[in-house]
Every structure is written in structure tokens, then in C-alpha cells.
Amino acid sequence: MKNQDKKNGPAKHSNSKGSPGQREAGPEGAHGRPRQTAPGAEAEGSTSQAPGKTEGARAKAAQPGALCDVSEELSRQLEDILSTYCVDNNQGGPAEEGAQGEPTEPEDTEKSRTYAARNGEPEPGIPVVNGEKETSKGEPGTEEIRASDEVGDRDHRRPQEKKKAKGLGKEITLLMQTLNTLSTPEEKLAALCKKYAELLEEHRNSQKQMKLLQKKQSQLVQEKDHLRGEHSKAVLARSKLESLCRELQRHNRSLKEEGVQRAREEEEKRKEVTSHFQVTLNDIQLQMEQHNERNSKLRQENMELAERLKKLIEQYELREEHIDKVFKHKDLQQQLVDAKLQQAQEMLKEAEERHQREKEFLLKEAVESQRMCELMKQQETHLKQQLALYTEKFEEFQNTLSKSSEVFTTFKQEMEKMTKKIKKLEKETTMYRSRWESSNKALLEMAEEKTVRDKELEGLQVKIQRLEKLCRALQTERNDLNKRVQDLTAGGITDIGSERRPEATTASKEQGVESPGAQPASSPRATDAPCCSGAPSTGTAGQTGPGEPTPATA
């Protein structure tokens, strides 16, 4: 018997350090082996007790009853656990059906189970927190899966971005054509205002959709809490089953130890009672038959318990596998949503910076244009009011987006059914950004038109200065002619006639030399006189200039 125990000892250690296939068996082998060895130990004890005295016979009669009591208690505990767990499953209804395929724990937890099942103690290498063993947090396959998903998303986004760019180019060309058909800038601004109103309506619709999505998120969070509660119940049932398995192992060990002690005692007794061996053979045979019957019963009970435990372990492993897969899928979806939100925030920041730069540029040009002409001041005031409205509405839009982003950060943990609708919202934000860029381009074109008009005004001012110089020259000539007329009146009529002819020829020559510059200056003065405040005064001076020498010549 001692030799057999020594052989069984290293066999157990070798099995615990065996191949991965044996590790996957988990607690099944740990629970099955002691139960199979227990009847053999009892049989050996029965054979050794046969030649004993009446006291040994009484002890034998009392011990099978105790063994039956222990086995009955263990079977009752198992039935209680099964009944409570089955009741929980029936009460859970359809909510637990998705959680029945929970995934199994990793290989480390399986090793800890086998270790605990064989020795009745937790493995020292793995820490226990709140009655559960910590699993390995970082798996090597998740990073590769994330990288492959990111590459697939980029490949899928490229054709979509190309299609979006083509659609945006067509919309911009249509908008530019409609703006070019309009003649006045007021009509262009009215068209832009209409398009901006359409954008506001679309934005309000998107806000309503965001509220609906938030409600759905709250429902998903409630479902997640329900699933966690069910998972905790399953973990409690598993802990109870593990405690039951440990009690069974302890019971089997106690049986083995008792069998070994009895074998030793009976070996000593055999040496003393070898003479009475032939008389007690009949009694021994009867006792052997009784023990065999009891052992067969115990074996059947152990086999039934082992089958039940195997079924329960398989169910737990399936459920744990399903739960691990669900959590990994949800983590990947959360990471994708976070990345998309960051991209949208960066795009919004860039649009704000561009808008501020363009606003400052337009304000500077407006100040300069106010100094140049009063008519452009009125148009610039209208543009400033519209820009103020745009900025206020854009700030409201930005505030709503910031609030929505805060709501998304609070509900980051599980987003299963929201990815499709979030993609639609991202498409709408890209459309909004494209339309904002088109409006900004239209404003830049207005600024370019303003610079062209400023250049035209400068050319007109140069022409007006030239006309003023001509008028001054004509006035000096008129004064000279008046002086000469006054001098000639005193000299005589004959001298006046001779002097007028050469003066008329010189005046006609001077007018012929200066007329090419005056003719082109007069045409733009007539057309562009309303654009500046100084034009009417110069025009009157130009009209009186060439008209005054006529009475002198007459």
C-alpha cells in the first residue's frame, strides 16, 4: 500500500505539469480521478478488515453509513446550486440568452482551476480579487486586429473622400454659376443668406437626431448593467461549484487516508491471527460482497456527479467565451468612435481659424474702403451685420457640438448600434464644411471686386487731377488775354485786330495739344462721377474753364 501511494503521488504531479491538452481538461480530470480511486481504497480496506475482531466489524458497519451521509449532503448541495442557477436562468428570460455563450477564461485561469481542484488550495502565482482571479489584461492579438481595422477603414475612406470631393466641386461650380448670373452684390448676398438658412434647418434636424441617439445610449447602458448583474450571478454560482469540488476532494483524501491506516492495522493483525484464517473465510466473503455492492453504488454516484460537473463547466466556458468576444467588439467600436470624434473636432477648429482670419481681413478692407468712398461704407456695414450674424450662429453651432462631444465622452463605454448613424452625421458635417468653404470663397471674390473698384477710383482721381491742371492753365490764359485786351483798348482798334490773329492761332495750337488728354478724361468723369465726393466740384471747374475764354475771344 505504501508503494502504491508513492507511485500515485508523482503520477499526480506529472499530470499537473503535463501537455496543454491535459490543461484544457481543467477541473474535469481533477474531479474525476479522486472519485475513481476512492472505491478502490475502500475495497482494499474491506479485504484487510476481514480477519479482524468484533470491534473491527462494528466499525466497518458504522463507516459506510457515514460515507453515505457525506455523499448525500454533497448531492443535496449540488442540487441546490443547480436549482438556484436554473431558476435564475428562467427568470432572466431573453436578456440572458445573449449572455449564455460567455467566453472561457484564458489559459492562466484554467491552470489555476486545475491547481485548485487537485490540491484544494488557490494557486499562489495568481492573485485573487473579490473572489475572482485576475486574468491577463493585455493580449497580443488585439493590437494587430486594431491595426488591420485601421488600414481597412483608410482603404474604404479613400474612394468615399474622392466621391465627396467630386460632389463638392460640382456644388461649388453650380453656386458660382448662380452667383455670376446675379448682377448686384446685394442679390448675391441674399442668395448666400438663403443657403445659410437651409444649412441652419439641416443643423437643427441633426440636433434632434443627436437627442434620439442619446436616449438610445441610455437604454444600452441599462442593458449593459443588467448583463453585468447576470454575469456576477454566474460567477457566484461558479464559486459555489468550486467550493463543492474542493469538499469532494477533501472527502476523497480522507477516504484514502482512512484506507491506508486500516490497511496498516490489518497487516499487523494478520500476523497474529493466521491460525483463524480458514474459519473466518466465509465471513470475509460475505463482507466482500457487501463492500462490493457499496463500492458499485458509490462509483455510480461519483460518475453521475462528474457528468453533471462536466456539463456545468462546458456551459460556463461557452458563456465566458461569448462575453469576452462581446467586450472586445465593443472596445474596438469605442476606439473607432473616439478617433472619428477627434477628427471632427480638428476639422471644426481649422474652420474656425480660417473664419477668424477672413473676418479680420474683411474688417481691415472695410476700414480702408470707408475712407475712400461713402457709398462703399453702406455696403460694408451691411456685410458687417451679416458677418456678425454668421459668427453668432457659428458660435451656437460650435457650442452645440462641444456639448454633444462632452455627452459622447461620458458614454464612451459601449456603442454597438450607433456607428451607422454617427457615420451619417459625419457626412453631414463634411457637407456643412464644404458649404462654409464655398461661402468663404464667395466673400473672397467680393473682396477682390472691391480692390478692382479701388484701383478704378485711383485712376479716376488721377484723371481728375489732370483736368484740374488743364482748368488752371486755361484760367491763367484767360487772365492773360483779359489783361492784353485792356492794354489794347488804349492803343487802338487797328492794333487790336493785328494782335488778335496771332493770339488766336497760338490758343488754337495750345488747345490742340491739350485736347487728347482732356477727351479721355472727360468720358470717365461723366460715367464715374457718382462714385466719389470730389468729382462734382472738379467737373464744374472743368465746365467753366473752357467756357470762359469765349467772351474774351468774342
From Swiss-Prot:
* GO CC annotation terms, alphabetical: cytoplasm
Coiled coil location: 186-491
Region (Disordered) spans which residues?
A: 1-66, 85-166, 492-554
Q: Which residues carry this modification: Phosphoserine?
A: 71, 515, 523
Which key words tag this protein in UniProt? Coiled coil, Exocytosis, Phosphoprotein
Q: Which GO terms describe its biological process?
A: B cell activation; exocytosis
Q: Name one GO molecular function term.
A: syntaxin binding
Biased-composition ranges, Basic and acidic residues, are 143-158
Q: Does the keyword Coiled coil apply?
A: yes
Q: Which Pfam families match?
A: Taxilin (PF09728)
* Family matches, as InterPro entries: Taxilin_fam (IPR026183)
Q: How does it assemble?
A: Binds to the C-terminal coiled coil region of syntaxin family members STX1A, STX3A and STX4A, but not when these proteins are complexed with SNAP25, VAMP2 or STXBP1, suggesting that it interacts with syntaxins that do not form the SNARE complex.
Q: Which family does it belong to?
A: Belongs to the taxilin family.
Q: What does this protein do?
A: May be involved in intracellular vesicle traffic and potentially in calcium-dependent exocytosis in neuroendocrine cells.
- Its recorded name reads Alpha-taxilin
Species of provenance: Mus musculus (Mouse)
